[in-house]
From Swiss-Prot:
Pfam families: YbaB_DNA_bd
Alphabetical list of InterPro entries matching this protein: YbaB-like_sf, YbaB/EbfC
GO molecular function ontology, one term from the record: DNA binding
Matches recorded under SUPFAM superfamilies: YbaB-like
Listed name of the protein: Nucleoid-associated protein RPB_0667
Highest taxon above the source species: Bacteria
Keywords from the UniProt entry: Cytoplasm, DNA-binding
Disulfide bond positions: none
A GO CC term assigned to this protein in UniProt: cytosol
Subunit structure: Homodimer.
Compartment annotation: Cytoplasm, Nucleoid
Length: 106
């Protein structure tokens, strides 16, 4: 019975820490780049796009396809960085709990 109560207490603590971590993830901002910085996408670690910056040289009619490709690449870069930031926070949160690798709590 004491083990069960201990697990319940640990679960409540984990839930509280998860809420705090979600707030932290909202504050972390990463920037995805492509085209040597011609396209930039800002994103929170919660995968919310916060802004897009496009160099004016890409806004010409004949640059549409290039711009599309650079937007996709910048978004992918931002997504990778946001995912890495989230994984780092999750590892810090769950590192001492002995959870199996890859257990998605986020």
């Amino acid at each position: 019975m004491a083990d069960f109560l201990g697990m319940m207490k640990q679960a409540a603590q984990l839930q509280s820490k998860m809420k705090a971590m979600q707030a932290e993830l909202d504050q972390i901002e990463v920037e995805g780049l492509s085209g040597g910085g011609l396209v930039k996408i800002r994103m929170s670690a919660k995968m919310e796009v916060r802004g897009v910056s496009i160099d004016p040289s890409l806004l010409k009619a004949d640059e549409g396809e290039v711009l599309e490709d650079l937007l996709v690449a910048a978004l992918a870069d931002a997504h990778r960085k946001a995912e890495a930031a989230m994984q780092e926070k999750m590892q810090a949160l769950t590192g001492g709990l002995g959870l199996p690798p890859g257990l998605g709590l986020g």
